[in-house]
């Protein structure tokens, strides 16, 4: 009798404690995510901030803003506004919009170009570069991986290429889209 009473109390207390644990679903409902690209900040230095709106567990829509802080031509872009669409694979449950992703983007950028001017010298011509700022528009693709913890903090890395569509003789034809970003969902 005593064993049955202890067993009933034990099962009852375990059942009651299981009801008291409510899962934290706050991260599941968070639809906005703000990120800063740490790689661009260290390598540039350039400020690259992004906002992504989570559309579903498998897709997101957002934009990035890149500002070259050094004036030394970070990837030849002085300024870039880059809207993007991402499609996420694999880790669709849990937090959604995480895991491996493929991204398509377009970039509207102010690009620094160089136009050479030949100067005659006895040893041969010397070309002195003149800088110009031009507008460029590109389309591209990137791929990467994103992790999100239960607190809503995220880390991602991505790598991609964009091709400039406006032809000039003074700018590159392609540009990289590279990053290691830290962010927070809200």
In which residue ranges do the predicted regions lie?
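Membrane-embedded beta-strand positions of outer-membrane beta-barrel proteins
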Residues: 36-38, 63-65, 83, 100-106, ...
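Outer-membrane beta-barrel pore domains and translocons
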Residues: 39-41, 66-68, 105-109, 158-164, ...
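Short loop/turn motifs that connect adjacent beta-strands in outer-membrane beta-barrel proteins
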Residues: 21-31, 57-58, 75, 90-99, ...
């Amino acid at each position: 009798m005593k064993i049955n009473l202890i067993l009933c109390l034990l099962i009852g207390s375990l059942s009651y404690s299981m009801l008291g644990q409510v899962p934290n679903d706050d991260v599941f409902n968070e639809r906005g995510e703000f990120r800063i690209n740490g790689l661009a900040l260290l390598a540039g230095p350039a400020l690259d901030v992004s906002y992504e709106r989570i559309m579903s567990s498998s897709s997101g829509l957002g934009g990035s803003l890149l500002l070259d802080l050094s004036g030394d031509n970070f990837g030849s872009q002085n300024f870039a506004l880059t809207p993007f669409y991402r499609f996420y694979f694999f880790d669709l449950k849990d937090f959604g919009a995480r895991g491996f992703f493929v991204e398509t983007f377009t970039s509207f950028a102010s690009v620094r170009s160089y136009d050479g001017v030949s100067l005659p010298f006895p040893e041969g011509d010397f070309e002195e570069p003149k800088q110009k700022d031009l507008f460029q528009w590109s389309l591209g693709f990137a791929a990467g991986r994103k992790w999100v913890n239960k607190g809503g903090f995220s880390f991602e890395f991505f790598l991609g290429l964009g091709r400039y569509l406006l032809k000039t003789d003074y700018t590159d034809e392609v540009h990289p889209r590279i990053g290691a970003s830290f962010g927070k969902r809200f």
